Amino acid sequence: MKIRKLRGIAEINDYIESYLAKWDLYACIDTDFAYDPTIDTVFWSVVVSEENDKAFKEFFKKLGCNVETDVFVYSIFHEIGHSQTLEILSDMDYNYSQDRKADPNISNEEYFNLPDEIIASQWAVEYINNNIDEVKTFWSGLQVLLKKFYKRNHIL
């Protein structure tokens, strides 16, 4: 069986990375959203998990996010939030969060409320609420590339 590369990933990554440059961050596709502070990289994904995505959007609303947008946007800004809040998190809170994340049975509710996760989400909500036009412009440009990606790869 021949495996082909998905076309358009580099273009999406470049777009995200150019946006992340304002925080001196890099972008890389992966199987899930994440932030790696050792390489200043935000990992992003096109994988959809309807249950988790719905729960994450609801969590952002509970935190006071006034902008209705795609979970991709919330996820990107949440990961940026990790980069912006890492230094204010105590070692004890960080270690506790990492220990709890090792539990494969952790619920979304507990995960979202871990010290490192909630502070990153709070940062994201504040940034999104205070920069609505910028966030909408970012998402509009990204949507064009994502739709092109789906079409080129016969995903939708």
Q: Residue ranges of each PLM-predicted region?
A:
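Active-site-proximal or metal-binding-adjacent scaffold patches in catalytic folds
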Residues: 2-3, 15, 38-42, 47, ...
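Zn2+-dependent metallopeptidase catalytic core
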Residues: 7-24
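Hydrophobic (often cysteine-bearing) scaffold residues that line and stabilize catalytic clefts
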Residues: 8, 12, 73, 116
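Active-site scaffold of zinc-dependent metalloenzymes
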Residues: 28-70, 80-87
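Post-HEXXH active-site segment of zinc metalloproteases
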Residues: 70, 86-118
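A conserved beta-strand element that flanks and buttresses the S-adenosyl-L-methionine
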Residues: 76
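Substrate-binding/catalytic groove segments of enzymes
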Residues: 84-96, 129-138
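Long, well-structured alpha-helical subdomains associated
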Residues: 103-156
